[in-house]
Amino acid sequence: MRNSIKTIKYLVLLANIYAVASHAEIQLSGNITQGGMVVGTTTPDNVVMLNERKLKVSKEGSFVFGFPWNDSTEYTLTIIDANGNKEQSSFKPIPRQYKQSNIKGIAKKIMNPNPANVARSAQDRKQTVAARKVDSDYNYFAQGFEAPRQSKVTGVYGSQRLFNSVLKSTHYGVDYRGQVGAKVQAPASGIVTLWVPDMFYSGGTLIIDHGHGINSTFLHLSKSYVKVGDVVHKKDIIAEVGKSGRATGPHLDWRVNWFDVRLDPQLVLDLPPIKQ
């Protein structure tokens, strides 16, 4: 096990863990960078800790973790085998530079919502927060992701968004061009945990659970072909592009979370499926 962890430490220092450890104890794939996701496999009865947080390990030995967009935390990954032997490796996410974009034409009622809409958006948030807390045993996240649309990317993760020249938010998704009614496919298999057709800010909002806290959110949809509880498979047609909610035109906003940690979907797409 010691040689395996030494290999992991070497890979971590390179910041990108695309190669996997040559030993069978643990394999990792991912990006040690802000917004990155790391998927690993290990012996199923090993305990995996990220700092003080115990990570779920599936019966196949899969586990996953990720980093916020502005993360500067020092992390320690700890592997404890069935005999109590412990190995550790420390690392820190590599910082990134993000773009800034100015979005014009945002309606006054969106920029300065009235009390009723503030209350409505708070209720919307409760629903999305609850859906993103789901900690299922599925390991669909380890099977690789594909883009939900094969169209031009018009907005990227981490960009600082100015609405009518006023700095308002950070964009946590990736935007794809598409006309109203254009098809959206599931980027990975999972279970539908939320569908609301008319949230105040995000409009038609769909969330799919991929397991272990990894979930996809699709915003501004005009239609969903699936409902809560449905099982979907990678590349299934699940919805249609729209311009609902706070959108100045039709497009798909796709987001990926690890619980409440917002990940970069384009980095997630870089991860190959993990052999199990």
Regions found by a protein language model. Give the residues of each.
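Zn2+-dependent peptidoglycan hydrolase active-site motif and core
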Residues: 187-222, 250, 255
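N-terminal signal peptide c-region/cleavage motif recognized by signal peptidases
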Residues: 19-21
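Extended, charge-rich intrinsically disordered regulatory tails
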Residues: 230-250, 254-276
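Surface-exposed, glycine-biased beta-strand/turn segments
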Residues: 90-202
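Sec-dependent signal peptide recognition
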Residues: 4-16
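Cationic-aromatic interfacial patches
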Residues: 24-97
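Short, well-structured beta-strand-loop connectors
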Residues: 183-194, 225-241
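Small beta-strand-rich domains/subdomains or short beta-sheet motifs embedded
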Residues: 177, 183-187, 218-219, 229-232, ...
